């Protein structure tokens, strides 16, 4: 078996990244850089391909429990801890521009933050970004958990929080653990109920984002709000 050190420079993941950028690398090559080394008889790129095949995707590998992660050949508790640290740093990096007092100036940045924050959750969460009159962030607040439907989402509770924080506008968001960001009819009904309730206190709902795996659906962009 050819060892990784014997590969041409342009085919080694680290050298390829430096020459062509991160977008040029496959999932297996990116994972290989994270793992750094393979195991007996298996180079790190081959090991990465095997792990992706076993888990099904990078998303599934990242979301794996400690026990499921550590039982795989070539992994272990040290790698699990390292991965969790990387994921948390990524989340904080995306969240930093969306901290209290900063204005929302980019829809893409907002989506990236919400996807990073919510796409791995194994249960549904209904939340909102509360904004002041200049669309500066007051806070991100999680309202409801579990199966999200008209019976569990109460516009009155959202209105109370909005009033207590003196918010002028909000962006609604909830996740679909299935990974499918498509908005259901129930999602649209809930949104309309909240929009109607907040109109009574002169608070605008700027958007409702449905977060799936690596992407989200915007009610505003689809003309549903």
From Swiss-Prot:
UniProt family annotation: Belongs to the UPF0758 family.
Protein name: UPF0758 protein Ping_0056
Superkingdom assignment: Bacteria
Residues covered by the MPN domain: 103-225
Species per Swiss-Prot/TrEMBL record: Psychromonas ingrahamii (strain DSM 17664 / CCUG 51855 / 37)
Keyword tRNA processing belongs to the record: no
Matches recorded under InterPro entries: MPN, RadC_JAB, RuvA_2-like, UPF0758, UPF0758_CS, UPF0758_N
Pfam family, any one: UPF0758_N
Binding site for Zn(2+): 174, 176, 187
Keyword Phosphoprotein applies: no
């Amino acid at each position: 078996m050819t060892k990784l050190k014997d590969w041409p420079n342009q085919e080694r993941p680290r050298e390829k990244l430096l020459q062509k950028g991160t977008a040029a690398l496959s999932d297996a090559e990116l994972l290989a850089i994270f793992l750094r080394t393979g195991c007996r008889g298996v180079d790190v790129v081959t090991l990465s391909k095997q792990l992706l095949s076993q888990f099904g995707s990078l998303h599934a590998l990242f979301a794996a429990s400690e026990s499921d992660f550590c039982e795989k050949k070539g992994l272990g508790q040290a790698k699990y801890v390292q991965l969790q640290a990387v994921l948390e740093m990524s989340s904080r990096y995306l969240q930093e521009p969306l901290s209290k007092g900063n204005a929302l100036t980019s829809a893409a940045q907002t989506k990236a933050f919400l996807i990073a924050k919510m796409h791995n959750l194994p249960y549904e969460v209904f939340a909102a970004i509360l904004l002041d009159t200049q669309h500066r962030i007051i806070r991100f607040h999680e309202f409801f958990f579990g199966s999200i439907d008209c019976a569990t989402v109460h516009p009155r509770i959202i209105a109370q929080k909005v009033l207590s924080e003196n918010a002028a506008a909000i962006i609604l968001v909830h996740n679909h653990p299935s990974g499918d960001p498509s908005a259901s009819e129930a999602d649209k009904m809930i949104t309309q109920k909240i929009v109607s309730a907040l109109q009574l206190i002169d608070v605008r709902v700027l958007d409702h984002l449905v977060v799936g795996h690596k992407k989200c659906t915007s009610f505003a962009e689809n003309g549903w709000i």
